[in-house]
Amino acid sequence: MEHLTLIPAWMLIPFAVMLLCIAVLPLIPHVGEWWEHNLHKLYVSLLLGTPVAIWMIANKMDHELIHQVVFDYIPFILLLMALFVTTGGICIRGDLKATPLTNTIILGIGWALASFMGTTGAAMLLIRLLIHTIQQRRYRVHTILFFIAIVANCGGLLSPLGDPPLFLLFQKGTPFAWWMQNMVGEWLVTGALLLIVYYIVDSYIYHHKEPTENLMADIREAGKLQMSGLINIFWLLCVIAATMFINKTYIPIMGEEHAAWYIKLLREWTFILIILGSWVTTKKQVRVDNNYSWTPIMEVACVFLGIFVTMAPALEFLRQNPLPITEAWQFVYCTGTLSAFLDNAPTAMVFHATASTLPIDAATAVAGIAPEFMKAISMGAVFFGALTYIGNGPNFMVKSIAEQEGINMPSFFGYMIKFSLIVLLPIYIIVQLIFI
């Protein structure tokens, strides 16, 4: 960077206010109803993001701003949109008996798929099936919360396709199979503990709290599985292939400093073509049967625009004022804590840069950092994204779809107090103590 601008601490205020808006506005009477409209979320994002953008341009940080919006936000949204549109065109219909075992199996399948089709892809593929399965149950919220943790986050640890921070670490030079070779233990133990806890919780609710009439309706209305829109399996594979192969590793010109912007965004152009292809080749009735709506992805786009812009000075502030951490366990919790409130992909990059300043053994280094730091950063970025609704893109989408289907989801703070801090965090601490 030719011109170094020191970020004052007060430039973190817009980002903090953005987070507070997401957390608090839905709880305020009347204001909560106003906040429900995506256009109003966009207004808030623009209100907070525009002054930040003006300040960055005035202080010769336009390069950082452009990079944050064009090369971070747009690819982030287009990848999520490509996965949302393709998986939203695969309709898995059926109302299975919503027993604890059935629900646990659905969660387990999503957990296994997440590393290979992305947490967003797996979540969007299975969330509607899960909601249809549990629709006769009175107590449904806990199932959606565990779905967010297991499928939309923790399942994506085994490959760069699983979660954006791992893809960026892959771009930094981590071998594609490194996570599969080195982090299966963390993936297995975390997933197994979450599935076991869910099965115990759902079994208790099923046998002791569910009204008999709800259980009888669930049995009476159960039906067989049916799938339609299978052309979207092809389009989903195209998304996976584009994510894996259309990058500067395989197309070096994309990484050249003076390459045209449209060359650098070649993967994103491909995503747009895939979105159009999926939309055109999918029968309209399939999406109707799937209760398809643009609302969830539009909510993510509007909210995360404000997050990405106001987050730019916050990330630069962290780069200029690195945290004094030197131990692997510290990287787990520092990366994890910030990933819960910042986007986990750029957060992983910040801590990769921090780790790269520490002494390493060149013979064992992974992407320029010690292997134990790579494991810690990966675990913190992927797992801790489940601690809040904004920690990972799919969280908001799952929440929005569930609310569209009449499930009353917890507030921002309610999610943390009633679920993530008392269920997820203890499990993460156990896994960290075992492996890192």
Predicted regions and their residues:
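Hydrophobic mid-bilayer segments of alpha-helices in multi-pass membrane transport proteins
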Residues: 11-22, 37-54, 73-83, 108, ...
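Interfacial loop-to-helix junctions that mark the boundaries of transmembrane helices
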Residues: 1-11, 33-43, 63-75, 176-186, ...
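Juxtamembrane and boundary regions of transmembrane helices in multi-pass small-molecule transporters
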Residues: 139, 158-159, 168, 177-221, ...
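Core mid-bundle transmembrane helix pairs that form the ion/substrate translocation pathway
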Residues: 179-281, 421, 432
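Intrinsically disordered, low-complexity non-transmembrane regions of multi-pass membrane transporters
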Residues: 1-11, 15-21, 25-29, 46-51, ...
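Membrane-interfacial helix-loop connectors
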Residues: 114, 124-138, 143-147, 151, ...
